[in-house]
Every structure is written in structure tokens, then in C-alpha cells.
């Protein structure tokens, strides 16, 4: 009984911490858009608006626009030629640059309506058509989380960087498929067999123009994957080698380099603390943090509030969980676990268990013409032979409890060992989300070629087909979202990554970077 009460207390604390952090991030995004809306509306009221073309001033068919937005990708920034672009791939609960242009009528959200009402009260009534006719003044770019950068602005360090917006909780497989079509263009094809097995639509959103349509062997790309994003790139790489995209003659040489930043290369014991069953790595405990997450995601997607999903989308649109599609009875089936991604196991957490990582890794190769570099993070140290958090204040509050718990991880004696040679002590060092051993290089079920690096100069010249890995002192989210937390470390890390991509990872000769002479 006492253990059960302690478990409930731990669940309450974990849920509260994660909810507070999520609310902080979300409210920051909303505040940014309120500021944009206020500034735009202020300009409208201070001067007479110029006449607008009919196409700009025309009222929008919101229903039709919403339907199109569900089916189509965002207007792309198209790259071509040299040097190869650097693609930053976010991790679990992450987001990219999901941009849509919207007018005041489309943004009939609570904050904009309240703002408009307040201004009419202060300045007097203004005809609605006059307000709409000035859409160029009040239009702004409604982005994922108000334009908040998952990579904390690192994408601004180079002119040729792409930040795709992939499903934040969808499976590694589905995210890899989305990533391909984001770059190459076309309608996302999740694969016939996979779609049937998991019970979702085969085809997803449409990218009428890819963000890098010339992508091929002669025009490869650099990938930087944070957390689960690293494993997404590895699965995509194998799909390219297997020519798994109909109509495209792909190969493993389409990827020039992969940098794994706190990458989930071998799974994590945190999944078991969050609620995955250690016995199989697929099922969830009846009462756990992930069950709360599951319920929240289902309700969020079922409600299907357009402006809210524009701010943040878990990526399950191909499961068609909207109330408009399934009704109230469909919600009951989803909550009871009869249908949906949580019923089929086609979501990201099973892929992040040690068992799930072994299943993925057994099909993934390290390719001889691709450069690999991995940054493994840890926020632990040894004290009298015991692994403990290396600091209290230096760990993000959302991660501190998990750092402490993961230090004390012990595999249950009644559960089969996940792989031959498994030892608990190997999995004690961690960064609050992933075990440090998991982030070094692919090592289970078999070890891939690797080399430990103390200083970046130790690995020059780089050799392809080898995982160079480095261990740095940091928690799992030090180098994302909030740049100020990392301080000078942020610039040192990303400058090193981008410089390696531009000057040390190439097959023929160093690429010519705009406004820079190759050295």
C-alpha cells in the first residue's frame, strides 16, 4: 500500500512538472502572436489603409481553407544546388517550422477576437469589410508555437538550413516517411503494408514543392538529429538504401553526414519510468504518466480545434481521430484502446524502449560513404562508487527527478534481459531523458564501427563509415528551446557541427559556401 501511495505521489509530481513546463512554452508562443496581432492592428488604426487588390481583400472560405490546410504542406523555402543543406530534425514532443499565412478572419481565436473587441470599444466601430480589406497589414505568419525555435535559433547560423515539422509523437517509421517527402516533395506515402497493419490512411499531407527537390546522390544532405530525431534519420537512410520510395531511384549516398545530438540510438530506461512495461517494451502500465499523456493526446486530436492544432500538432492526422470523422463513439473506442495509434503501437514510445531500439537497429546499417558524429550528454557523476546527479541547479527542473531515478535503474529480476551482456551499471549515467550509453553509437544488438573523441581535432580528417562520439556535460534539453541556458556552450557546439558539415564532411572537395572562401 505504501509503495502504491508513493507511486501516485511520484506520478502527481511528474505530471505537474511536465504540465507547467508545457504551459510555459505554449503561453510564450501565444504571447508572441498576441504581440504580433496587437502591432498589426495598431498600424491599421493609426493610418488609413491603402486600397488592396480584390484577391487580397476577399473573404476566406474558412471551411475550405481548413480542409486544404489539412491536406497540404506549408509553402516551402526551396533550396537547390551547392552547398548541401543542413537539415535539423527535432525529437519527441518537438516541432519545426510549420508556417501558414492566415488573415484576421481565419485567426478567429479567443485572443484575437478579444483584442479586436477591445480596440472597437476604445476607438469606435470599424466596418468588418474595411478590417478584412487591410489583410496585408494584419496578416502574420502563424507558426508552430508562435515561431518558437526548437533548436533555439541555431538554424540562423547558416544560410542553408531546413527545420522540418514532423509528427511529435508519431512512430520513427512514420516520421522518416514524412521527412523524405518534406525534402523531395509529393504526397506522404506511409507504405501500404505498414498502413494496413497499423490501421491508418496510407497517404498524408501534400508537399506540392519539396524543400530540396534536387535531392539525390549528386546533391546529398547533412542531417543533425536531436534525441529521437537521430534515429528517424537512420531509418530514413535505410529506406533510401532499400529504395523504399516508389517512383524514386534512391540510394544510401543521398545522405552525406549524420550528426546525432543526444540521440536515442539504443533506447532508454526512462520509458519504463514513464510507464512502458519492461517485460515487452510495447504495453503501458494501467496507471502512469504515459496514460495521462495518451488521454490528453486523444482528446486534443478528437476536439480538432484548427487554431490550436496550428500551434501544435502531435502528428496523428493520418489516423483521422477528429470528432468530425469518428464522433463521440469513436472517442470512446480511442480512450478504451480499441483503435488509434496507441492501440496499434504505432507511436514513438515503443520505439524508444531498449527492446524497440534493438528491433530497429537489427535492420539498420552504418554506410561506408556517410560521415557520422555523435554527442552523448550526461548529467551524472560517481560519488563513493555510486552514480548521482552531477549538480542540482544545473539540471532542468523537468528532468531532475528522472536523472535521479535513472541513476538507480535496476532491471526487474522477473523480466528477461533485453540483450546478451546487459549490465545495470552500464545504463546509470544519463541526461534525464536518455542513458549516456545509448547516445554514443549504435551498439545493440551489434556494435557499429566507432571511435571515441576527446577533442574535435582528434578526428580530422574524418573518415566515413565510422561513428565518432564525444561525451559532454549537459542535460537532455540544454541545447534546444532556450539558448540562454547553455550560454557560450551553445555557440561552441553548433558552430562545431556546422563547421564540420561545411569543411570536413565531403566526398570530392569542400563545398563553396556563399560569401565564404573554401579553406
Residue ranges and their predicted role:
Residues 1-214, 495, 499-519:
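Flexible, membrane-associating and regulatory peripheral segments of lipid-active enzymes
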Residues 2-20, 25-57, 63, 248-519:
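Helical cap/lid subdomain of alpha/beta-hydrolase-fold lipid enzymes
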Residues 83-84, 218-220, 368-370:
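Short coil/turn segments at beta-strand junctions that form active-site/ligand-binding loops
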Residues 89-92, 226-227, 263, 377:
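Glycine-rich His-Gly loop
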Residues 183, 240-244:
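Active-site catalytic pocket residues across diverse enzymes, especially alpha/beta-hydrolases
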Residues 212-226, 255:
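Alpha/beta-hydrolase fold nucleophile elbow
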Residues 225-229, 233:
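Gly/Ala-rich beta-loop-alpha elbow adjacent to hydrolase catalytic centers
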Residues 234-240:
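Active-site signature of alpha/beta-hydrolase-fold catalytic machinery across serine-
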Amino acid at each position: 500500500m505504501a509503495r502504491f501511495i508513493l507511486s501516485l505521489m511520484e506520478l502527481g509530481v511528474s505530471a505537474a512538472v511536465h504540465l507547467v513546463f508545457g504551459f510555459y512554452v505554449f503561453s510564450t508562443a501565444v504571447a508572441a502572436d498576441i504581440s504580433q496581432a496587437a502591432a498589426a492592428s495598431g498600424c491599421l488604426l493609426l493610418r488609413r489603409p491603402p486600397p488592396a487588390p480584390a484577391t487580397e481583400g476577399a473573404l476566406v472560405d474558412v471551411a475550405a481553407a481548413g480542409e486544404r490546410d489539412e491536406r497540404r504542406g506549408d509553402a516551402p523555402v526551396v533550396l537547390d544546388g551547392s552547398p548541401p543543406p543542413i537539415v535539423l530534425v527535432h525529437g519527441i514532443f518537438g516541432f519545426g517550422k510549420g508556417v501558414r499565412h492566415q488573415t484576421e478572419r481565419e485567426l478567429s481565436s479567443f485572443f484575437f477576437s478579444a483584442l479586436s473587441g477591445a480596440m472597437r470599444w476604445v476607438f469606435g466601430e470599424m466596418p468588418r469589410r474595411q478590417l478584412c480589406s487591410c489583410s496585408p497589414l494584419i496578416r502574420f505568419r502563424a507558426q508552430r508555437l508562435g515561431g518558437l525555435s526548437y533548436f533555439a535559433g541555431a538554424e540562423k547560423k547558416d544560410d542553408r538550413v531546413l527545420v522540418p515539422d514532423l509528427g511529435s509523437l508519431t512512430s520513427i517509421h512514420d516520421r522518416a516517411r514524412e521527412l523524405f517527402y518534406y525534402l523531395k516533395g509529393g504526397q506522404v506515402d506511409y507504405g501500404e503494408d505498414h498502413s494496413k497493419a497499423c490501421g491508418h490512411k496510407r497517404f498524408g499531407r501534400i508537399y506540392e514543392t519539396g524543400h530540396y527537390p534536387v535531392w539525390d546522390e549528386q546533391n546529398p544532405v547533412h542531417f543533425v538529429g536531436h534525441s529521437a530525431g537521430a534515429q528517424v534519420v537512420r531509418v530514413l537512410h535505410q529506406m533510401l538504401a532499400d529504395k523504399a520510395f516508389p517512383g524514386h531511384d534512391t540510394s544510401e549516398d543521398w545522405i552525406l553526414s549524420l550528426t546525432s545530438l543526444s540521440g536515442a540510438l539504443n533506447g532508454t530506461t526512462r520509458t519504463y519510468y514513464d510507464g512502458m512495461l519492461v517485460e515487452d517494451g510495447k504495453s503501458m502500465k494501467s496507471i502512469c504518466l504515459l496514460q495521462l499523456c495518451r488521454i490528453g493526446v486523444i482528446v486534443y486530436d478528437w476536439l480538432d480545434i484548427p487554431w490550436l492544432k496550428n500551434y501544435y500538432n502531435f502528428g496523428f492526422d493520418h489516423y483521422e481521430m477528429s470528432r468530425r470523422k469518428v464522433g463521440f463513439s469513436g472517442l470512446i473506442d480511442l480512450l478504451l484502446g480499441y483503435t488509434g495509434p496507441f492501440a496499434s503501437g504505432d507511436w514513438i514510445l515503443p520505439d524508444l524502449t531498449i527492446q524497440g531500439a534493438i528491433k530497429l537497429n537489427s535492420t539498420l546499417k552504418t554506410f561506408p560513404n556517410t560521415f557520422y558524429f555523435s554527442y552523448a550528454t550526461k548529467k551524472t557523476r560517481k560519488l563513493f562508487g555510486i552514480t548521482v546527479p552531477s549538480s542540482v541547479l544545473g539540471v532542468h527542473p523537468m528532468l531532475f527527478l528522472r536523472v535521479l531515478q535513472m541513476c538507480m535503474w535496476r532491471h526487474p529480476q522477473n523480466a528477461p534481459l533485453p540483450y546478451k551482456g546487459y549490465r545495470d551499471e552500464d545504463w546509470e549515467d544519463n541526461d534525464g531523458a536518455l542513458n549516456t550509453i545509448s547516445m554514443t553509437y549504435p551498439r545493440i544488438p551489434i556494435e557499429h564501427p566507432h571511435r571515441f573523441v576527446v577533442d574535435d581535432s582528434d578526428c580530422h580528417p574524418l573518415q566515413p563509415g565510422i561513428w565518432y562520439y564525444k561525451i559532454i556535460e549537459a542535460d537532455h534539453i540544454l541545447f534546444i528551446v532556450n539558448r540562454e541556458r547553455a550560454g557560450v556552450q551553445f555557440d561552441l557546439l553548433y558552430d562545431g557541427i556546422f563547421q564540420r558539415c561545411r569543411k570536413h564532411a565531403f566526398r570530392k572537395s569542400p563545398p563553396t559556401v556563399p560569401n565564404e572562401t573554401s579553406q
